[in-house]
Amino acid sequence: MSIVNKLLHTRYRVNDLDRTVKFYSDVLGLKEIKRHKSPRGSELVFLQVPGSEEQIEITCFPAGGPVQVQPDLTHLAFEVESLEEFAQHLAGLGIKYSDGPTTSSAGTRFAFIDAPEGYEIELIQRRGTY
């Protein structure tokens, strides 16, 4: 018996909810599946990751003050079919890779883009094992 069954969602706090949701939708293709206000007054948006059950929960709690991304929180990673094709998609949106593409010793290729609020996104093109 496993202790947990699966990862359900990851929560990120942001200053500009609509700008962040637009980025994840337009750039990465995530779908907004739920939006509501919590009893404590924060606004919540759940985004579905394509091809999986995992979600990203984006929250904005204005009374909490400006968001400061912790230096140790480095990135979210998403798999893509082709870094070259994804770079063309990004170019159409006026976005460039902030780092990479780079190839690991196992042949996996990866690159990074900057997301709103100081978060970073890793894009991985797998080759064989990760």
Where are these regions (language model features)?
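Vicinal oxygen chelate
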Residues: 1-3, 35-36, 46, 87-130
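Helix N-cap motif at beta-to-alpha junctions
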Residues: 16-17, 80-84
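N-terminal beta-strand motif that seeds the catalytic metal site of vicinal oxygen chelate
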Residues: 1-19, 73-76, 127-130
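Short, charged/polar surface micro-motifs in flexible loops or helix N-caps
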Residues: 51-55, 63-65, 83-85
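Short amphipathic alpha-helices within nucleic acid-binding modules
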Residues: 23, 84-89
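Exposed loop/turn and edge beta-strand positions of beta-sandwich/beta-sheet ligand-binding modules
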Residues: 41, 72, 107
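Core segments of cupin and vicinal oxygen chelate
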Residues: 11-53
